[in-house]
Each structure stands twice: as C-alpha cells, then as structure tokens.
Amino acid sequence: MIKLCVQYPVEGGSFFDFDYYLDVHLPMSEALLAEYGFLGYEVQHCTTTISGDDPEFLCITQLEFSSLEELREGMQERGAELSADFARYTDIKPIATVTEVIARST
C-alpha cells in the first residue's frame, strides 16, 4: 500500500478552514481519485508536542492508494483540479511525501 502524506506546516498569520477541508475538499478528492486506486484517508489535527510545545504542523493527511502507479496517474489526471481548490481552505503550501507501508499493527 502507498500513502500520500500531505503536511500543512504551522505558519503565522495563515488560515486553514477545517470545515471546508473535511466537508468539501476531501469528499471531492475521494470522488475524483476513486478510479485511481484510492482506498481512503486519515486526517490528523496537530495540537501539541509531547513536551507541550507548539506543533510543527497544523494538519497531516494521509491518503491511501493501491499502488504508486495509480497515485501518479490520479495526480496527473486530477492533480490540477485538486490543487485549484487549495485556496478555498488554506493559504499554506503543503508538503507532500509518498510513503510505502511496510508494517502495520491493528
């Protein structure tokens, strides 16, 4: 399994509309990427560090795909459409990293 890990760094003065992100952007992403091996997503709202400091990231989202090839195809075909929606929920430039799941506990 492959994950696209999208991280939104904390930036002073920036905005992030979690309601829009959860209610509009992610369902749109799911619909647009369904035919490209999209399996689901997990959203994490970063609130603090273990030591109680401010977190480095505001939000981390992991989108799961069947394969890297399908992820790449989906981004090639639908990436521009998804990116065009970013400004509706944030002005933060996301950091996207592809990861491969090599172990998982349940």
Stretch-by-stretch model annotation:
Residues 1-106:
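Macromolecular interaction modules
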